[in-house]
């Protein structure tokens, strides 16, 4: 089965073609980072309009890259949520319309299921069951995965997602947008011993997270020490986040008895986190899996892949369509 994937949940326009027998045939991503940089964050209306401008040309380009005509597509997968409503509607409208015109099935894909399954696109994919840490600008959660759709949420953020905390702290340090990668780069220059930030919620049982207090702690430290301390603040902030995520992952693995950990979402590209989780994996005899760096961010390949699995199982979305700003991951049907 050849599935066309469309991702428009936020500020990236991603399109891809996945073949259930041949694998990923083509993948193209357009980033809106420059468009939003002057505003310090994503402007939803601008994001929607840019998706409208870019999506159809990208679809033609990805089909050409795959060596296919639109009639060669067996199904269409589009992100149905969670995300920005206006941005989601662009991808959903185009995806549903194309599927209807071709007489092919369409499926609305959960954005975070796309991230969750993205390591399965790699040459050495994890087997089921596994524990997953999903970390992005909008989500932070620990999940057990017994098979596709069989998800149990072990813990999640009670306030800011980890990617959001990175971006907000980067904005305090005047690092521009997108802030997460800029903060990580600045942290490499920081003194790890100058400041110590608290490790939130490690002093209590459970696997939930809280990151909003770290942003406030960074702001207070900046006010006391001035901008010359920016690199040291970035280092202290990142160390606190990495320690917290690592400890929670270890707890989740010990509680579940699983020996495979998937880490996915935009923040999974953070190299300091990867180094710590690698060390933890060695200590705990746990194999840690990631998507390739290009698939850590939002992309069409993960949507095409996840959609293909559900279409092959006989699932499809009804002829009408709706999108969701919020969509609990553990409400998805098992396949």
Curated annotation (Swiss-Prot):
Cellular component terms, GO, for this chain's entry? cytoplasm
**Co-factor: note:** Binds 1 Fe(2+) ion per subunit.
| Reaction(s) catalysed by this chain's protein | L-threonylcarbamoyladenylate + adenosine(37) in tRNA = N(6)-L-threonylcarbamoyladenosine(37) in tRNA + AMP + H(+)
Q: Tell me the CDD domains matching this sequence.
A: ASKHA_NBD_TsaD_bac (cd24133)
Q: Where does substrate bind?
A: 134-138, 167, 180, 270
Cellular localization per UniProt:
Cytoplasm
GO molecular function terms attached to this record: iron ion binding; N(6)-L-threonylcarbamoyladenine synthase activity
Q: What does this protein do?
A: Required for the formation of a threonylcarbamoyl group on adenosine at position 37 (t(6)A37) in tRNAs that read codons beginning with adenine. Is involved in the transfer of the threonylcarbamoyl moiety of threonylcarbamoyl-AMP (TC-AMP) to the N6 group of A37, together with TsaE and TsaB. TsaD likely plays a direct catalytic role in this reaction.
> What protein name is recorded for this chain?
tRNA N6-adenosine threonylcarbamoyltransferase
The species this protein belongs to is: Nitrosococcus oceani (strain ATCC 19707 / BCRC 17464 / JCM 30415 / NCIMB 11848 / C-107)
Its taxonomic placement starts with: Bacteria, Pseudomonadati, Pseudomonadota, Gammaproteobacteria, Chromatiales
